[in-house]
Swiss-Prot record:
Gene3D superfamilies linked to this entry: Glutaredoxin (3.40.30.10)
Phosphothreonine modification, residue list: 183
GO BP: any one term: response to oxidative stress
Species per Swiss-Prot/TrEMBL record: Bos taurus (Bovine)
Keywords: Acetylation, Antioxidant, Cytoplasm, Disulfide bond, Oxidoreductase, Peroxidase, Phosphoprotein, Redox-active center
Gene designation per UniProt: PRDX2
CDD domains found in the cross-reference section: PRX_Typ2cys
Active site residues of this protein: 52 (cysteine sulfenic acid (-soh) intermediate)
Matches recorded under InterPro entries: AhpC/TSA (IPR000866), Peroxiredoxin (IPR050217), Peroxiredoxin_AhpC-typ (IPR024706), Peroxiredoxin_C (IPR019479), Thioredoxin-like_sf (IPR036249), Thioredoxin_domain (IPR013766)
UniProt protein name: Peroxiredoxin-2
Domain spans labelled Thioredoxin: 7-165
Subunit structure: Homodimer; disulfide-linked, upon oxidation. 5 homodimers assemble to form a ring-like decamer. Interacts with TIPIN.
Keyword field contains Signal: no
Residues bearing PTM N6-acetyllysine: 197
Localization (cell): Cytoplasm
Length: 199
């Protein structure tokens, strides 16, 4: 079966419904539940592995920073909700997750991984995909890492802040932009103000 990616930047993000572990309980979660909020949707290969807990714990520990931006963070793997719960119930010192501040979604059918173009078909697991979806449900950013390298929570947070800034102000954010930094007015004459200051 060939993977047909339905996730395209600038287009509506593929809708999904999945069982998640939320605050230690099972709950059905849909993308549409988060309408009006930004969503950082990140895929990881498998529970009870090595890089994955470092990413999940890092996102969970900083969930409040995303919430301040009206943004939810959702983790997804091809494991079942039962495996997610077992991993959450395993102490961090033993390679577990411990209590989390973010939901973990179960993608046992691999439909979500396939729709978002991160399914590694020969192994039946997901690559490390990260998707930023805006409050209108439009996919704004995609990053997909190969399996051995984790992602940066700082960069995910910066991307949400940058897209929210451009949405609100109509200006564009240069490379490495952080809140409070200069932005660029997106027309030939006004952009010279930025370039004359920074070159």
């Amino acid at each position: 079966m060939a993977c047909v990616c339905k996730a395209h930047v600038g287009k509506p993000a593929p809708e999904f419904q999945a069982t998640a572990v939320v605050d230690g309980a099972f709950k059905e979660v849909k993308l549409s539940d988060y309408k009006g909020k930004y969503v950082v949707l990140f895929f990881y290969p498998l529970d009870f592995t090595f890089v994955c807990p470092t990413e999940i714990v890092a996102f969970s520990d900083r969930a409040a920073e995303f919430h301040k931006l009206n943004c939810e963070v959702l983790g997804v793997s091809v494991d079942s909700q039962f495996t997610h719960l077992a991993w959450i119930n395993t102490p961090r010192k033993e390679g577990g997750l411990g209590p989390l501040n973010i939901p973990l979604l179960a993608d046992v059918t691999r439909k979500l991984s396939s729709d978002y173009g991160v399914l590694k078909e020969d192994e039946g697991i997901a690559y490390r995909g990260l998707f930023v979806i805006d409050g209108k449900g439009v996919l704004r950013q995609v990053t997909i890492n190969d399996l051995p390298v984790g992602r940066s929570v700082d960069e995910a947070l910066r991307l949400v802040q940058a897209f929210q800034y451009t949405d609100e102000h109509g200006e564009v954010c240069p490379a490495g932009w952080t809140p409070g930094s200069d932005t660029i007015k997106p027309n030939v004459d006004d952009s010279k103000e930025y370039f004359s200051k920074h070159n």
